[in-house]
Swiss-Prot record:
Lineage of source species: Bacteria, Bacillati, Bacillota, Bacilli, Bacillales
Protein purpose: Catalyzes the irreversible NADPH-dependent deamination of GMP to IMP. It functions in the conversion of nucleobase, nucleoside and nucleotide derivatives of G to A nucleotides, and in maintaining the intracellular balance of A and G nucleotides.
Active site positions: C174 (thioimidate intermediate)
A GO CC annotation given for this chain: cytosol
Residues involved in NADP(+) binding: 203-226
Entry annotated with the keyword Phosphoprotein: no
PROSITE patterns noted in UniProt: IMP_DH_GMP_RED
Gene source species: Staphylococcus carnosus (strain TM300)
Record bears the keyword Signal: no
Keywords: NADP, Oxidoreductase
Family: Belongs to the IMPDH/GMPR family. GuaC type 2 subfamily.
EC number(s) reported in the record: 1.7.1.7
Reaction equation(s) it catalyzes: IMP + NH4(+) + NADP(+) = GMP + NADPH + 2 H(+)
Source taxon at top rank: Bacteria
Protein name from the UniProt record: GMP reductase
Length: 325
C-alpha cells in the first residue's frame, strides 16, 4: 500500500477542452439532492450553527448540523422543512439517541440526511444505530463514521449506511494521533485511496484539508464529498468568539472532542486554536468553486468525474518548495 498525504501528491495535467474554467461544472449529486460543490463544513460548534445551516441549504450547499444541541434538533428539522429546505442532522450512539430516532418516526419527521458522528465509527454501536435509523426512517440518507480502513467502510455499508465518513484524527484541532497513537493523520489521502477500493457507496473525506487543491486531490482518490473544518472557520458569519491579538482579528476554533466543547477534561482528543479572521463565507465558497473549476480544466474535462481519471506523482513534501507558513 502506498503511503502519502495531500502535500506529497501533485496531479498531472491533461489537455484542456474548455475555453474558460467557468464552463466546468463543480456540482455533485449526494443522496437525494444535488449541490453546487462537493464540500461540506465540518459539523463542529465553531464551524456550523442553525443560521449558517439555513444559509447553506438556501444556496444549494450541503451542510451537516452538529449534535451538541440535542434538544434543538426536532425544532430545527421542523423549521428547515417548513421553509422548504432540507434537514441534515447528527446523532451519537448513546441509548437516548435510539429513543430520539423513534420519536422522529412517531412525529412523522423525516430528515433528509442523518450523520452518525463518533470518533471511532468502526464499531457495533454504529452498526446498530444504522439499523435503527433504517428501520424507523428508511428513506433518510444515512452517513456513518468515522472510519479509516476498507473493513470499516465495508461493514458500515453492509449495515445499511448510504455513505461513510473517512478520517481518524487528521484535522488541525484533532490530537487523536498524539493522545492514542492511532489515526490517519499524515496519511489521510492514502487512507481515502485505500478505503475507496472497498467502497460501493459515496465516501466523505474528513480532515486534513489545508488548501483548495486538496479538495481536487480527495476526489481523485475516491471521495464524493469533502469535509472541511479550519478553512471554513473564522469567517464573519462563523460561530465562535472573536478576539484581537497584536492588532489582528481571530476567531476560536476547537475540536469536537476537546475540553472546550465537552466542558470537562475527560477523554480529550481535541484542542483549541485561534484562526485569523477571513471575511465572508460567500467569498470563500466562490473562490473554492473557481479553484475547483480550474482543477477540472487541468484534468482535461468539464465535470468532477474528470478528476478521478488523472495520473499523479508522489513528491514528498516538495509542493510548497520550502515556502510554508
Amino acid at each position: 500500500m502506498k503511503i502519502f498525504d495531500y502535500e506529497d501528491v501533485q496531479l498531472i495535467p491533461n489537455k484542456c477542452i474548455v475555453k474558460s474554467r467557468s464552463e466546468c461544472d463543480t456540482s455533485v449529486q449526494f443522496g437525494p439532492k444535488r449541490f453546487k460543490l462537493p464540500v461540506v463544513p465540518a459539523n463542529m460548534q465553531t464551524v456550523m450553527n442553525e443560521k449558517l445551516a439555513e444559509w447553506f441549504a438556501e444556496n444549494d450547499y450541503f451542510y451537516i448540523m452538529h449534535r451538541f444541541d440535542e434538544e434543538g434538533r426536532i425544532p430545527f428539522i421542523k423549521k428547515m422543512q417548513d421553509k422548504g429546505l432540507f434537514a441534515s442532522i447528527s446523532v451519537g450512539v448513546k441509548d437516548k439517541e435510539y429513543d430520539f430516532v423513534r420519536e422522529l418516526a412517531e412525529e412523522g419527521l423525516k430528515p433528509e440526511y442523518i450523520t452518525i458522528d463518533i470518533a471511532h465509527g468502526h464499531s457495533e454501536q454504529v452498526i446498530n444505530m444504522i439499523r435503527q435509523i433504517k428501520s424507523y426512517l428508511p428513506e433518510t440518507f444515512v452517513i456513518a463514521g468515522n472510519v479509516g480502513t476498507p473493513e470499516g467502510v465495508r461493514e458500515l455499508e453492509n449495515a445499511g449506511a448510504d455513505a461513510t465518513k473517512v478520517g481518524i484524527g487528521p484535522g488541525r484541532v484533532c490530537i487523536t494521533k498524539i493522545k492514542t497513537g492511532f489515526g490517519t493523520g499524515g496519511w489521510q489521502l492514502a487512507a481515502i485511496n485505500h478505503c475507496s477500493k472497498a467502497a460501493r457507496k459515496p465516501m466523505i473525506a474528513d480532515g486534513g484539508i489545508r488548501t483548495h487543491g486538496d479538495i481536487a486531490k480527495s476526489i481523485r482518490f475516491g471521495a464524493s464529498m469533502v469535509m472541511v473544518g479550519s478553512l471554513f472557520a473564522a469567517h464573519e458569519e462563523s460561530p465562535g468568539e472573536t478576539v484581537e491579538l497584536d492588532g489582528k482579528l481571530y476567531k476560536e476554533y476547537f475540536g469536537s472532542a476537546s475540553e472546550f466543547q465537552k466542558g470537562e477534561h475527560k477523554n480529550v482528543e481535541g484542542k483549541k486554536m485561534f484562526v485569523e479572521h477571513k471575511g465572508t463565507l460567500a467569498d470563500t465558497l466562490t473562490e473554492m468553486q473557481q479553484d475547483l473549476q480550474s482543477s477540472i480544466s487541468y484534468a482535461g474535462g468539464k465535470d468532477l468525474d474528470s478528476l478521478r481519471k488523472v495520473d499523479y506523482v508522489i513528491v514528498r513534501n516538495s509542493i510548497f518548495n520550502g515556502d510554508r507558513d
